[in-house]
């Protein structure tokens, strides 16, 4: 039962970190009339 909770917390933390990095504005790519893939 404890393993399920620890696994859920681990996956949730990694998911939040991945979400923050993936949807972060790319600092090295200036937008010059080109629509970025990450933003809607």
Curated annotation (Swiss-Prot):
Q: Which GO terms describe its cellular component?
A: chloroplast thylakoid membrane; photosystem II reaction center
- Per UniProt, what is the membrane topology? Single-pass membrane protein
Gene it is expressed from? psbT
Q: Which domain of life is it from?
A: Eukaryota
Q: Which UniProt keywords apply?
A: Chloroplast, Membrane, Photosynthesis, Photosystem II, Plastid, Thylakoid, Transmembrane, Transmembrane helix
**Regions crossing the membrane:** 3-23
Which family is this sequence assigned to? Answer: Belongs to the PsbT family.
Pfam families recorded: PsbT
Origin species: Anthoceros angustus (Hornwort)
**Quaternary context:** PSII is composed of 1 copy each of membrane proteins PsbA, PsbB, PsbC, PsbD, PsbE, PsbF, PsbH, PsbI, PsbJ, PsbK, PsbL, PsbM, PsbT, PsbY, PsbZ, Psb30/Ycf12, at least 3 peripheral proteins of the oxygen-evolving complex and a large number of cofactors. It forms dimeric complexes.
InterPro entries from the UniProt entry: PSII_PsbT, PSII_PsbT_sf
Q: What's this protein's name?
A: Photosystem II reaction center protein T
The record's subcellular location field reads: Plastid, Chloroplast thylakoid membrane
So what does this one do? Found at the monomer-monomer interface of the photosystem II (PS II) dimer, plays a role in assembly and dimerization of PSII. PSII is a light-driven water plastoquinone oxidoreductase, using light energy to abstract electrons from H(2)O, generating a proton gradient subsequently used for ATP formation.
GO BP terms? photosynthesis
